[in-house]
Regions:
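Active-site-adjacent structural elements that line small-molecule/cofactor binding pockets in enzymes
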Residues: 1-115
Length: 115
C-alpha cells in the first residue's frame, strides 16, 4: 500500500517524506517551491530519488458564478504541474449549485489533463 504524508514542516514532515513516503501532499502556498527544494535536500541526504515521490496538492476550486476564475485556476494548476505536482484534490465552492461542477467538467478538467 502506498504511503502519503501530508504537511510542509521542513525538519520533520518533509524529512519523513524523503525517508519513507511514496507521495506527499503540500498546500499551494507561495512557499511551495521552497518546500520542494527542502524535500530535494532531504532526498539527497537519504540517497532517495526525489522524482520517485509523487507530489500532490490540496486546492480550493472557486470557478466563480459564471466561470470568471477558470483562467486563474488553470494557470495556478499549470504552475504546480511545472513544479512536478501530478494531482490536485480539493473542494469545489458552491458545489450544491451544480453549475460550478459543470464549469469544472467543461473547462478546468480538460485544460488540466493537457499538462
Amino acid at each position: 500500500m502506498p504511503i502519503m504524508i501530508g504537511g510542509m514542516g521542513e525538519q520533520k514532515t518533509l524529512r519523513l517524506v524523503a525517508k519513507y513516503a511514496d507521495a506527499c501532499n503540500l498546500f499551494p502556498t507561495p512557499q511551495v517551491a521552497h518546500k520542494l527544494d527542502v524535500l530535494k535536500r532531504h532526498c539527497e541526504r537519504y540517497k532517495r530519488n526525489y522524482d520517485e515521490i509523487e507530489k500532490t496538492t490540496m486546492f480550493g476550486f472557486d470557478v466563480g458564478d459564471r466561470g470568471e476564475n477558470v483562467g486563474q485556476i488553470v494557470e495556478r494548476l499549470r504552475g504546480l504541474s511545472r513544479m512536478g505536482f501530478s494531482s490536485a484534490m480539493g473542494g469545489v465552492k458552491d458545489v450544491w449549485k451544480i453549475t460550478p461542477l459543470e464549469i469544472m467538467a467543461r473547462e478546468v478538467i480538460p485544460a488540466a489533463a493537457a499538462f
